[in-house]
């Protein structure tokens, strides 16, 4: 186009600048000859390099307008679903969508409605989709099928030469390594230090601050835009001055369109639906502007979205500038109760208890104490204070319930 070719004067010398715009994802790979695996090249800074077969396959996958997470995985069935994970999701779904007819469906039918199980009438085939297995599957089948993908959360707020992280969530044999569990484990840790507004009736959404929404959007964006058929790590790093979210797969859209908002080309639209149905993620294309607005409100540096075309990954960095006055306010708030509309320390902990119960109605007091970093006796005092939290039943059938305030 004409705007991509123009003269430019440098040190009194006129040169002609020819800008080669990035090809649309639906047109990639652009190649020479008849074989894309032999004729595809990409520019890495100072030169053009032959694309690897993995890179070409990734570009071909990205041509699919319907995303790739609806792919039926042969030989994978409902036996590969971790029912405990699925039922935790259904508990949250039921809480958010009380009158939804899907609540009465059997697990397999419910999963089909979400896009996690699919029938292919033409091929007369059926089975779990990529979205279904990755979101709710057992750890071993997931690692067998997606052996080049990892999940990793690290808190590096107080590291030293011999301490590389303060907290970590990764494959360690203590949990079923699916995406829903990863979100469940990481989100409370990610937002643990953020203040909450003084509104207790809206457990899931109304008590969100712009920062809570931004962190959630960053986490969800990392998942719905990840290329799970490639190689890499879903990585979240929490530091004192920043949060970093990394996913495998390069950007499908130019950065300027992403920053502008209103455009969404998720690689995993079925996962996007699954998360949106429980209150995670808003209108398509609005996620990144939500993050930008939250950071602008705090007058923090603009979020940085960086693409590494060598490692084939994208990293979103959210920098947070420390403010001594803000720290002083938090200290005063903890000692004296609510201040400027934020929750007191105990009310904040009760809100976190409610989140834990919604995730897992059978959560134990010991698990509550471990997550909140307090003693079991302190947990019991909080439970005694929270009149809307009740324990029903006994033995294996016992579980927590939350009574909505009138």
Predicted regions: what they are:
Residues 369:
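The alpha-helix within a helix-turn-helix
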Residues 1-36:
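Divalent-cation
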């Amino acid at each position: 186009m004409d705007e991509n070719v123009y003269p430019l004067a440098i040190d009194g010398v006129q040169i002609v600048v020819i800008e080669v715009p990035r090809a649309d994802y639906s047109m990639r790979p652009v190649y020479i000859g008849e074989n894309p695996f032999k004729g595809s090249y990409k520019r890495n800074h100072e030169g053009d390099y032959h694309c690897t077969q993995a890179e070409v396959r990734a570009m071909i996958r990205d041509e699919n307008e319907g995303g790739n997470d609806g792919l039926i995985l042969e030989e994978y069935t409902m036996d590969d679903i971790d029912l405990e994970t699925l039922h935790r999701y259904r508990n949250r779904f039921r809480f958010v969508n009380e009158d939804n007819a899907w609540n009465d469906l059997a697990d397999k039918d419910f999963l089909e409605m979400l896009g996690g199980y699919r029938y292919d009438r033409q091929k007369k085939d059926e089975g779990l989709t990529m979205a279904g297995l990755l979101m709710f599957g057992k750890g071993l089948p997931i690692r067998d099928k997606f052996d080049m993908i990892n999940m990793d959360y690290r808190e590096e707020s107080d590291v030293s030469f011999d301490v590389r992280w303060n907290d970590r969530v990764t494959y360690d044999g203590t949990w079923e390594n699916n995406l829903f569990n990863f979100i469940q484990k990481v989100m409370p840790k990610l937002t643990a230090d953020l203040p909450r507004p003084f509104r207790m009736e809206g457990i899931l959404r109304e008590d969100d601050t712009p920062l809570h929404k931004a962190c959630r959007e960053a986490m969800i964006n990392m998942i719905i835009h990840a290329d799970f058929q490639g190689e890499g790590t879903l990585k979240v790093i929490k530091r004192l001055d920043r949060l970093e979210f990394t996913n495998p797969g390069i950007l499908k859209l130019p950065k300027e369109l992403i920053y502008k908002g209103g455009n969404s080309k998720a690689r995993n639209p079925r996962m996007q639906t699954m998360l949106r149905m429980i209150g995670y993620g808003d209108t398509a294309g609005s996620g990144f502007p939500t993050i930008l607005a939250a950071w602008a409100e705090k007058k923090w540096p603009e979020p940085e979205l960086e693409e590494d075309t060598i490692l084939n990954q994208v990293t979103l960095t959210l920098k947070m500038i420390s403010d001594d006055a803000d720290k002083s306010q938090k200290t005063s708030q903890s000692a004296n109760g609510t201040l400027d509309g934020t929750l007191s320390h105990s009310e904040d902990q009760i809100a976190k208890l409610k989140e834990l119960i919604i995730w897992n109605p059978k959560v134990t007091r010991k698990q509550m104490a471990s997550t909140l970093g307090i003693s079991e006796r302190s947990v019991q005092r909080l439970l005694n204070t929270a009149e809307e939290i009740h324990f029903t039943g006994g033995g294996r059938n016992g579980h927590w319930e939350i009574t909505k305030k009138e």
